[in-house]
């Protein structure tokens, strides 16, 4: 077993949440700034924290905007679904004895809201959320925290994500990275493996 721990990002990797996230952010910005941003101008938000997203958009009252964003996202919760093959993949990995974990830029309250409803969520431990670290992707902090909590060495971990921020986080931590091509906007993001579909992971383990 080359890797002992298989670690996943959430948005764009485990769950298809792109449209709910983009439309809710667009709605927040319309409320706060009076401007309707094109959705394509907001895709940079994937892979970084909500706070960092709002900072880049020059929002002044970030706590209030975040609270509004949470409220609007709750209205779109039913639109967030697992990607095809994910449930089969996770069940297979669990039965095969791999440790499963999550590293996400979501705060824990959103992680529980968006992902906790899926029964496979109970298979993942540890889960590192944005509020668990001072550093966030693309810095190595989230993966270093994962190593601390899991006891795994960097050589034993494969991190799977959809964004360049995930890729850089893995690189900075010295961890191998697989790009979730099925949910990625950047198909040329540096990676050790490129996975067209979730079950393609089985061929590299």
Where on the chain are the PLM-derived regions?
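Acidic, Mg2+-coordinating phosphoryl-transfer loop and its flanking beta/alpha structural elements
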Residues: 158-194
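Short, acidic loop-to-helix structural element flanking the phosphoryl-transfer center
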Residues: 75-102, 108-112, 140
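Short amphipathic alpha-helix with an adjacent loop that forms part of the alpha/beta core around
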Residues: 201-205
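Conserved Lys-Pro-Asp/Glu-containing loop-to-beta segment of HAD-superfamily phosphomonoesterases
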Residues: 5, 137-165
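A short, structured active-site edge motif that brings together acidic residues
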Residues: 41, 121-136
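N-terminal helical cap/lid subdomain that shapes the substrate entry/recognition surface
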Residues: 2-88
């Amino acid at each position: 077993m080359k890797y002992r721990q298989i670690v996943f990002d959430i948005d764009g990797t485990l769950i298809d949440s792109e449209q709910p996230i983009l439309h809710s952010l667009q709605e927040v910005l319309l409320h706060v700034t009076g401007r309707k941003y094109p959705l394509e101008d907001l895709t940079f938000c994937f892979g970084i924290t909500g706070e960092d997203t709002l900072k880049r958009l020059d929002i002044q009252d970030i706590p209030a905007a975040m609270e509004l964003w949470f409220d609007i996202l709750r209205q779109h919760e039913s639109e967030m679904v697992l990607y095809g093959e994910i449930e089969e993949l996770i069940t297979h990995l669990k039965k095969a004895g791999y440790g499963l974990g999550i590293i996400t830029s979501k705060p824990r309250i959103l992680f529980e809201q968006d992902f906790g409803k899926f029964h496979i969520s109970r298979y993942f431990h540890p889960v590192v959320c944005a509020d668990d670290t001072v550093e966030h992707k693309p810095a190595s902090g989230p993966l270093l925290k994962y190593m601390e909590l899991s006891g795994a060495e960097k050589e034993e971990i494969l991190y799977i994500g959809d964004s360049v921020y995930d890729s850089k986080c893995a690189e900075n931590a010295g961890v191998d990275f697989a790009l979730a091509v099925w949910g990625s906007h950047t198909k040329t993001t540096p990676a050790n493996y490129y996975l067209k579909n979730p079950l393609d992971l089985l061929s590299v383990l």
